[in-house]
Amino acid sequence: MATEQQDSQLCLATILEDFLKQRNIQVSVGVDSSSLKKADETFGGRDLPVDPSDLRRYEAARWVRNTLGVVGGRDLPADPSEEDFRIALRSGILLCNVLNRVKPGAVPKVVEAPNDPLVNQDGAALSAFQYFENLRNFLVFVEEMGIPTFEVSDFEKGGKSARIVECVLALKSYREWKQSGGSGTWRYILNSKPTTFGIAKQYKRKDSEVPVDAVTNSPSSTPSSEQPLLDQSDSNTKNDGTASSIDAIVRAVFSDMKQEDIPVIVEDMLKSVMVEYERRLATQNELLLMSAGNRDKLGSGDLGRTISGNEETLSDASYGEENVTEIVNNNMEASQDSNVEELENQDYELYAISKEKTEKQQLIIERQQTHTEELKHDLKAVKAGLSLLQMKYQQEFTSLGKHLHGLTYAATGYQRVLEENRKLYNQVQDLKGSIRVYCRVRPFLPGQKSVLTTVDHLEDSTLSIATPSKYGKEGQKTFTFNKVFGPSASQEAVFADTQPLIRSVLDGYNVCIFAYGQTGSGKTFTMMGPNELTDETLGVNYRALSDLFHLSSVRKETFSYNISVQMLEIYNEQVRDLLATNEIRNSTQDGINVPEATLVPVSTTSDVIHLMNIGQKNRAVSATAMNDRSSRSHSCLTVHVQGKDLTSGVTLRGSMHLVDLAGSERIDKSEVTGDRLKEAQHINKSLSALGDVIASLSQKNNHIPYRNSKLTQLLQDALGGQAKTLMFIHISPELEDLGETLSTLKFAERVATVDLGAARVNKDTSEVKELKEQIASLKLALARKESGADQTQLQRPLTPDKLLRKKSLGVSSSFSKSANSTRQVQTKHKPSQIDDVNSIEGQSDSASSLDLQGLVGSPSWKTPPRDGKEEDMEFIIPGSEWVDKHEDEITRSSKPENRAHTQLEKRTSSLKREATRGVDKNKCNSSVDKGLEVRKIPYEEEANESDETATSDCSETNLMWQLNVQVNMPRPASNGSSTKLKKNQSKISRVAAETRSMIPSLIPTPTRTLSLGAAISSPGQTSSRHNNSTVVVKKRQNPK
């Protein structure tokens, strides 16, 4: 019987549990007391959550703590109540920090809480600024992100904290979407169910209550202990473990329910219990009917026991119903009492807390007002100070602005004056003909160990070198040049200063630019560039020709230019053509120094690069200990420019010589042997000869040793005053090269002191050409007309006067061989004027030219005497190419035969007749210096000085090559042998041929216009040509 009653109570508990599950009311039925005690210890006696909103709040709180860390989220509990959650987040600090973790920089400045011990940590009143500023920044940014927001009033008591929780969870969802890759569009969907939480069973109990054992679903389970029900007055024998389980279930269900919901739940619960009991009774009745066939077999005892069992079951059911009703009533009374007491306690606590908060807030407000007054006072003081500082700063800025404006104006004026001074200085240099000297300091090469530099100071035109004691007085040596380029100067900057000089080639001037310095100092880099050429590293040669092409294309409407290029080198005192091997010649009419050398017309920069690459391949280059690409020869790139004015027909001729000298080197440093040693000796010898020429030019000596080296002969016209000359001086900054650096800089100082004279334009106008053609035509006609007289004069016998003329020509030829004899004669006699008829003789390609092969063997002719007082006789000696330009002028005061007769009478009257002729011959030989007159044809300068071409004072070979010498001799008094005259002519031809030089001039031969009056004013002064030169021997008889 007891077992059946126990089963009935167990069924009642099962019915209640199924009912609660249908209503989504979770209650633990199969949890033992130890599990309840463990849960109680885990939550520390706090109220366990029942509502899903609590779970979402816990989830939001824990995410905030995990995001900010233990320190950042220390003010927010892990499982906060609604009040704790609201108080922790009401300042907005945690929310702004979390937002900055999700979106860095969303809230630039978070207003932190004041570090004041008087502020309550459980949510005391904050400052109005902090309370509003943080929340406002958070809500503005969150609303832009599309996250659900809340109101500031939700943080007040009674506010809707659920919106705050939803906002935090939406922010959590956004961060998870962003961490997963952010694919697609993020959208937050409200979810009322908690995601994860560790508590599946939920209940609430008081701290004063003892845990109640639960009843398991297993029918074999028995109650472990018996506990009295709360407020239960009577004791019942059936109050066992099952009743306690039902009591625990009911109390657990009704503990957190509202008072108005309890009757409804109780009514539904009772209905469920009655329905279940009715179902079970019907089942039992069916079982009884099905066993009706067996009733006969049953005994009366058994039937009675069955009836009594049913009655007991019904009684148990009625007892359970009464028990539930009683439990519900007791619970309702207990809950009402406890609620009233709890409400009273809460009211008292709230009143105390409110009072305490009010006092603290009042204190805080008072302190804030005090601080506000202090801040206002400080703000006024700061504003006054700022106004004063602003006024002072304004005054200072105005003063500085005026001063800066003045400095700017002065700097602008200084730059303008500096530019004008530079232009004027360049003009003065052009007028003086001084050699411009630019200095360039080579940078340290990559990989060099030495970092000590000898360059102490460097400015625009000044260079200071630090010198140790072994080079003289320890200190600095300062050098001044036209321009100084530092190690960081680019190729473009170097070319920019030489560009005006290079462009003057198109205007008809001759220009020479050469690089000087020791080996490895960067000469080839400046002139040509490195092996691998780029737009930034192109040398002066490439840039100069590119600029000439560009300028010629700009002027193509007014001028027509023809540009051609030659490349030469001097290797071991031998002149070679880098584009083709030919013999070097002297200057010719068109300015081309090697007539048979390769002269290539160019029109584009690519043509120039191609030719220069060919020349560089042919140039002698070798590696030494000081330089991997040491130039073993002097190279010269010559650019010939011939322009024609399309309007006036004026022809301009200019040439530019870009010379890359081989570097001077010390044998012990370069470590050269064999052929390299021989090359170094020739290089140093030629550079030494260049130094001697510069020294002579700076000292203005009469004799300049150009012929000591092929290099000086090559640069003769550039250094002789016919060209605008510029020298690049290159030095190395290494300390071990200090000796070579000082020597190079001193040489450059001597070069800067040389004055060559102003260069002139090489211009030929159409009028000058016409006059030259007329003069040549008239001279040709005159020569043909008087050719018969010349033939008669050559057939006359040799006389003592002709012997005297032969002796005189021998003396003249000696002058062209020795420069010392020339200087001695110049000190005794006056130099005669020179007329260069090269422009007339240069018309060899026209019909009116004097360069005719038919005049080679034509004899000289006889000219009539002037006024019956002077008899002239010309004798043409062909075969000489030039004679020395320094000849002596000797005049006679009487006729030779009369003077000879007078001298014979004075010396002796007792000489025998057979000795008279020998004495006369000796007298004639001793009177050569008095009886010989070398007269050079004077020229008549043109009216327009700009149309004549300048002649170099130092280019004596060019002038001598164009010179006609006329020697005046007395008319022969007796007949002589014509064979002696022919022998004398051949001797003079050999002497003249010995004086001819094979070294060219870099500058085109200047032309001077021979006036018509000067050419034909004297009928007896005619000449003929042979091999580009003519020696005219003339006898002049002065009146007594």
Swiss-Prot record:
Domain of life: Eukaryota
SUPFAM superfamilies in the record: Calponin-homology domain, CH-domain (SSF47576), P-loop containing nucleoside triphosphate hydrolases (SSF52540)
Protein name: Kinesin-like protein KIN-14H
Record's compositionally biased regions (Low complexity): 809-818
Binding residues for ATP: G517, Q518, T519, G520, S521, G522, K523, T524
Calponin-homology (CH) domain residues: 54-176
Biased composition (Basic and acidic residues): 887-923
Annotated source species: Arabidopsis thaliana (Mouse-ear cress)
